Swiss-Prot record:
Belongs to the class-I aminoacyl-tRNA synthetase family. Glutamate--tRNA ligase type 1 subfamily. Pfam families: Anticodon_2, tRNA-synt_1c. It is an enzyme of class 6 (ligase). This is Glutamate--tRNA ligase.
Length: 491
C-alpha cells in the first residue's frame, strides 16, 4: 500500500518549530517511502484563522523546500484541501452516521450534566455522561419544542481502545475513560473532532504522524474510524505515530510565546534551510548515535518513523547555531555568495561592492559566521553610513600607544604602489613588525580597529584592499586622531 501522510495545520499565528518539525517528519517519511505528502489547511475557526497565517505556512514550507504532492495551489484528486470549503462533505457524513445509529442527537446542557453527576455522587467535572444515548423520538421532539438545538455525538464502544503506536508501542485507553463525544456544535457546524478524521478517511491517509499532545484524541478517532468503515466511508484505519514534545528553557514545553519557537525569527537571524532542517530532524530522531550533521537528502534516505524517540526533545539554541554554521561552511562558494546577497538585499544591507568584490568579501566571512546576519556585523565597515568605532574595541586598542603605530602604518601604506592584499601585508609588516619591533597583535590591533571599527573583523589585509586606498588612509588618520584625543583627555 502506498504511504500517504498529511500535514494539516490551522492558519493561526506564526509557524513554530514544533509544528514544522512535525511537517518535516511527515515529508521525510513520504519521500523515504515514495509516498504522498498531503498538505491540508484546517481553517474551521473563523475567529482565529487568518489569511496572513495561511500564507505564512506556504512561505515556511517553500523556504525549507518541503514540497507537497497534494494541497493548496497544487490541487489533487481529493480537492478542496481547505476544510472551510468541505462543509457539505462533513454534513453528508453526519447524516449517514445518524441514519446508521452510529451517532445520536444530544440535548443535555452542561449544567444538566453537572447536576446529574452531583446527584450521583460523582465528580461534576467528569464530562458528558452519555445520558441522551437512548432518548425516544417523543423525548427528542419535546426538547426541540423547547427550542433546544442538539449536538451530534458518536457512540463510543463499550470496550477498551487499544492501538500499536509506531513511536510508543501498544497504547490502551480503558473502557469508560472516553465518553460519547460531540461531532457538531448546537448550530450544526462540524467540529474538529469530526472533520479531521473524515478528511483523513476520504483522502486515504495511511499514517498519521503528529504531536503527542494529540494522543488523548486517538481513542475518539479510532471509534469514529470504526463507524466510518461500517457506513462505507472508508475501508481502513490509519496507523498512528505520536511524536515527542519539544521542550524549551527549564524543560517546559516550548510555547508559541518563546522566541525560539518562531520559525521566521530563525530565518531573520540568517539560518539557512539546510541548517534548520538538520536541527529540527534531531528533535526526536537521529541518523546515527555518533553523527549529528547530515543533509536533507541523507535524512530522507535514512528516515523511518519507527526510529523516532518517544522521549521529549529539548530545543538547544547553541547546538542549532553550531549546526547552521557547519552547513554554511559546506555551501560551495558561489551558492554562499548568492545566499548572502539575497539576505543582504532582503534586509537592506549594502556593502557598496560590485559583484566580483562582494564575492571576495563573502569568501572572507563564510567560515567565520554562525548565521547570515553575522556577516553584516563583519562587513558593515565597508558601508560608510554603517561604519562606527566599537567603544569597547576602541578603548582597548586606540590608546596612547596606538599613535606611533598608526602613524607608521599611514606612512607605509602611502608608499604602496598597487593596492593589493600582498603589497598591503608586506608594507605593514615591514613598518610595524620589523620597523617598530612589535608583536603582530600589538602591531595590527590598532590598525584593525581604526579601519573596521572592531577588534573582530575579516582578515585585515584583505579588508584594507576591499575598503580601498583612500578610505583606508582616511580611517587610519581618524583612528590616530581618536587615540591622540584619548591621550589628551587622560592628561
Amino acid at each position: 500500500m502506498k504511504v500517504r501522510v498529511r500535514f494539516c495545520p490551522s492558519p493561526t499565528g506564526t509557524p513554530h518549530v514544533g509544528l514544522i518539525r512535525t511537517a518535516l517528519f511527515n515529508w521525510a517519511y513520504a519521500r523515504h517511502t515514495g509516498g504522498d505528502f498531503v498538505f491540508r489547511i484546517e481553517d474551521t475557526d473563523a475567529q482565529r484563522d487568518s489569511e496572513e497565517s495561511y500564507l505564512a505556512l506556504l512561505d515556511a514550507l517553500r523556504w525549507l523546500g518541503m514540497d507537497w504532492d497534494e494541497g493548496p495551489e497544487v490541487g489533487g484528486p481529493y480537492a478542496p484541501y481547505r476544510q472551510s470549503q468541505r462543509r457539505d462533505l462533513y454534513l453528508d457524513v453526519i447524516r449517514r452516521l445518524l441514519a446508521a445509529g452510529e451517532a445520536y442527537e444530544a440535548f443535555s446542557t452542561a449544567e444538566e450534566v453537572e447536576a446529574r453527576h452531583l446527584a450521583a455522587g460523582r465528580n461534576p467535572k467528569l464530562g458528558y455522561d452519555n445520558f441522551d444515548r437512548d432518548l425516544t423520538e417523543e423525548q427528542r421532539a419535546a426538547f426541540r419544542a423547547e427550542g433546544r438545538q442538539p449536538v451530534v455525538r458518536l457512540r463510543m464502544p463499550d470496550a477498551d481502545m487499544t492501538w500499536v503506536d509506531l513511536v510508543r508501542g501498544e497504547t490502551t485507553f480503558p473502557v469508560g475513560s472516553v465518553p460519547d463525544f460531540a461531532l457538531t456544535r448546537g448550530s450544526g457546524d462540524p467540529l474538529y473532532t469530526l472533520v479531521n478524521p473524515v478528511d483523513d478517511a476520504l483522502m486515504k491517509i495511511t499514517h498519521v504522524l503528529r504531536g503527542e499532545d494529540l494522543l488523548p484524541s486517538t481513542p475518539r478517532q479510532l471509534a469514529l474510524y470504526a463507524a466510518l468503515i461500517r457506513i462505507g466511508v472508508t475501508d481502513m484505519t490509519p496507523q498512528f505515530a505520536h511524536l515527542p514534545s519539544v521542550l524549551g528553557e527549564g524543560n517546559k514545553k516550548l510555547s508559541k510565546r518563546d522566541p525560539q519557537s518562531n520559525l521566521f525569527l530563525h530565518r531573520e537571524r540568517g539560518f539557512i534551510p539546510e541548517g534548520l532542517l538538520n536541527y529540527l530532524a534531531l528533535l526526536g530522531w537521529s541518523i546515527a548515535d555518533d553523527r549529528d550533521i547530515f543533509s536533507v537528502q541523507e535524512m530522507v534516505a535514512a528516515f523511518d518513523v519507527a526510529d523516532v524517540n518517544s522521549n521529549p526533545a529539548r530545543f538547544d539554541q547553541k547546538k542549532a547555531d553550531a549546526l547552521n554554521a557547519e552547513h554554511i561552511r559546506r555551501l560551495d562558494e558561489a551558492e554562499f555568495v548568492r545566499r548572502l546577497a539575497d539576505y543582504f538585499s532582503t534586509h537592506g544591507y549594502d556593502t557598496g561592492l560590485d559583484d566580483a568584490r562582494f564575492a571576495e568579501a563573502a569568501a572572507l566571512v563564510q567560515t567565520r559566521i554562525v548565521v547570515l546576519g553575522d556577516a553584516w556585523d563583519l562587513l558593515k565597515f565597508l558601508d560608510e553610513s554603517s561604519f562606527a568605532l566599537d567603544e569597547k574595541s576602541a578603548g582597548k586598542e586606540l590608546k596612547d600607544t596606538a599613535v606611533p603605530v598608526l602613524t607608521a602604518a599611514l606612512a607605509a601604506l602611502k608608499g604602496v604602489g598597487e593596492w593589493t592584499t600582498a603589497q598591503i601585508e608586506d608594507a605593514l609588516k615591514v613598518a610595524l613588525i620589523d620597523g617598530l619591533e612589535l608583536k603582530p597583535r600589538k602591531a595590527f590591533g590598532p590598525v584593525r580597529v581604526a579601519v573596521t571599527g572592531s577588534s573582530i573583523s575579516p582578515p585585515l589585509f584583505e579588508s584594507l584592499e576591499l575598503l580601498g586606498r583612500d578610505r583606508s588612509l582616511e580611517r587610519l588618520r581618524a583612528g590616530r586622531d581618536h587615540a591622540a584625543a584619548a591621550v589628551t583627555m587622560d592628561a
